[in-house]
Amino acid sequence: MESKPSRIPRGISVQPSSSLSARMMSGSRGSSLNDTYHSRDSSFRLDSEYQSTSASASASPFQSAWYSESEITQGARSRSQNQQRDHDSKRPKLSCTNCTTSAGRNVGNGLNTLSDSSWRHSQVPRSSSMVLGSFGTDLMRERRDLERRTDSSISNLMDYSHRSGDFTTSSYVQDRVPSYSQGARPKENSMSTLQLNTSSTNHQLPSEHQTILSSRDSRSSLRSNFSSRESESSRSNTQPGFSYSSSRDEAPIISNSERVVSSQRPFQESSDNEGRRTTRRLLSRIASSMSSTFFSRRSSQDSLNTRSLSSENSYVSPRILTASQSRSNVPSTSEVPDNRASEASQGFRFLRRRWGLSSLSHNHSSESDSENFNQESESRNTGPWLSSSLRNRCTPLFSRRRREGRDESSRIPTSDTSSRSHIFRRESNEVVHLEAQNDPLGAAANRPQASAASSSATTGGSTSDSAQGGRNTGIAGILPGSLFRFAVPPALGSNLTDNVMITVDIIPSGWNSADGKSDKTKSAPSRDPERLQKIKESLLLEDSEEEEGDLCRICQMAAASSSNLLIEPCKCTGSLQYVHQDCMKKWLQAKINSGSSLEAVTTCELCKEKLELNLEDFDIHELHRAHANEQAEYEFISSGLYLVVLLHLCEQSFSDMMGNTNEPSTRVRFINLARTLQAHMEDLETSEDDSEEDGDHNRTFDIAYFI
């Protein structure tokens, strides 16, 4: 079946019971009305104003009951969904299965009514349509037949009703609702109103088959219409006992109330599985519109737990009935967080610590108004109503909360020890023993409660201590047998929140847990200035073993003999003043052999003064001259000119020898030439100190001689 855009308002036929008492679920306790409603033609407007309609009924009285937003979070919540204007067929529908509801309070003989101006309007999110089903098995077929006939009649009002047996067919009239193509916020302010048309029949509607129409207010401008007092009074009389489930089927799911009661547990399991598939998509569309639907601070705190549970599990569990009863019976606000904490252990497991901390903030109601405001804002922030899947998808919205959750989850396991008690020490010498939880399953939920009990016991000891010590003193948690100290800021002494910065300090080895002091005087080194001065003087006055006489600045030795005395070659003073004679000769010879000039040899390298030498058997000028001649001869030989001359002589002698080969005088001449060259080379070898060069020359001349 091809699904069509369902913008068609539909009439609702309800047969009321005369014995039923009218209930007002939220706001407007109402005034008495005539027994009949006068009908008014519904006109569709495309502008920003909403359409208010009235219901027409027969002479028999009927009951008009609907939920406000605070009651939606506690009981059954029928989500009205809007379809897109582009006639797409991908529209998930929510089918609401009605169950038995307990009777409300009697207002009087007159019927409670809602005037045209008192109808609360709600903005329906994008791509959603609400289908309210009643009891009967033939309604599904009529619904399909009706959608086939309504291709082009979008603005026509069609009323249909089905009368079969003990059931009464009911539907709803949905006026124009906003539709937008993108984003989570609506672009117009058009509203939708539910019109209830009742007609008298031969059968009466039993109280257990009562159809309840719910409309949700997502406009923050209508918060003032219903005070938190009226919400609390209506909440105390409300005991919802039914569940709803979300589905993607095109046709509504119709279920009998007796069947739901008999098979309540399997239905909850199946609805849980079906609801989780569509929760992510639906909640992503209404994330922005739902963010402004809190009534007041206190009413949002009361409905915070059930709202988060319903958005997470996608169905309202009968367990909420006990929470609503406990809230109605016990007016104290300090016990409401306890009920929420008990429900929190079954719902959001990752928010146990946050609810525990918010419940702690409610216990300190005796603080100033500024602190109460901080506690209310903190408890409102620490209990997010969106599911974990949406929190993971909406990174810009909830990244700060995820970081705080990770910081808190990383802090709390550090203080979770198994069997020994934690000692929390305060500056006012108060010691509170906090017993560690032994239950591994409830450790995460019990940890904030235990800390709340310990802090309340500490602050409850004396009023002056709770007022002054809780604000001005810090809590330092010292773990026995550990090397870490956890320090909490002083402002959080009496009320712990999740925004806590904990500093970790390493306790030194000399830490004494009895008095809380460390023996720094024992391990610290001595800083006595008198002792340091004595050490410095002793180092300066200490005599060296080698300081008996003057030392040579080259060999660092004293005068050993009379032949090798210490001299003063230059104007250097101190340890460089004296030099041995032998050490000075060796130093000067090394400078001469290095090829230094005479001026560089006779000049001190340190003081740049002329050396005054009177050495025996050591003439610097003669040594430098001899070395200069040797350098010249070596340069001549190294240049190759000598070899060229020698080669020329050999060629002449060889030519003469070749011309007179047979003459013996030629051989004698050649031998004499070789000897002459050998003698000349021997003279050169005597002036060379290199023995290797001598061997090479000798081998060369030997070869020439034997030739």
From Swiss-Prot:
Which sites bind Zn(2+) 2? 570, 572, 604, 607
| Residues recorded with modification N-acetylmethionine | 1
Annotated region (Disordered), positions in chain: 1-126, 157-279, 294-343, 361-425, 444-473
> Function of this protein?
E3 ubiquitin-protein ligase which may specifically enhance the E2 activity of HIP2. E3 ubiquitin ligases accept ubiquitin from an E2 ubiquitin-conjugating enzyme in the form of a thioester and then directly transfer the ubiquitin to targeted substrates. May be involved in T-cell proliferation by regulating LIF secretion. May play a role in lysosome homeostasis. Promotes 'Lys-6', 'Lys-11' and 'Lys-63'-linked mixed polyubiquitination on ATG14 leading to the inhibition of autophagy by impairing the interaction between ATG14 and STX7.
Instruction: Tell me one Pfam family matched here.
Output: RINGv
Give residues where Phosphoserine occurs.
Answer: 317, 389, 687, 691
RING-CH-type zinc finger segments: 544-614
Gene Ontology CC: cytosol; nucleus; plasma membrane
Superkingdom field: Eukaryota
Q: What is this protein called?
A: E3 ubiquitin-protein ligase MARCHF7
Write down the species.
Pongo abelii
What does the entry's domain section say?
The RING-CH-type zinc finger domain is required for E3 ligase activity.
Q: What is its EC number?
A: 2.3.2.27
The protein's UniProt keywords, in alphabetical order, are: Acetylation, Cytoplasm, Metal-binding, Phosphoprotein, Transferase, Ubl conjugation pathway, Zinc, Zinc-finger
| Biased composition range(s): Low complexity | 17-33, 52-65, 294-303, 444-470
Chief subcellular location equals: cytoplasm
Q: Which Gene Ontology molecular-function terms are recorded?
A: transferase activity; ubiquitin binding; ubiquitin conjugating enzyme binding; zinc ion binding
Q: Where does Zn(2+) 1 bind?
A: 552, 555, 580, 583
Amino acid composition bias (Polar residues), ranges on this chain? 66-83, 95-126, 189-212, 254-270, 304-336, 373-392, 412-421
Task: Spell out the SUPFAM superfamilies in the cross-references.
Answer: RING/U-box
Tell me the pathway: Protein modification; protein ubiquitination
Question: Which GO biological-process labels does this protein carry?
Answer: negative regulation of DNA damage response, signal transduction by p53 class mediator; negative regulation of intrinsic apoptotic signaling pathway in response to DNA damage by p53 class mediator; negative regulation of proteasomal protein catabolic process; negative regulation of protein autoubiquitination; positive regulation of cell population proliferation; positive regulation of protein polyubiquitination; protein autoubiquitination; protein stabilization
According to the UniProt entry, which residue ranges have a biased composition of type Basic and acidic residues? 37-48
Q: Which reaction does it catalyse?
A: S-ubiquitinyl-[E2 ubiquitin-conjugating enzyme]-L-cysteine + [acceptor protein]-L-lysine = [E2 ubiquitin-conjugating enzyme]-L-cysteine + N(6)-ubiquitinyl-[acceptor protein]-L-lysine
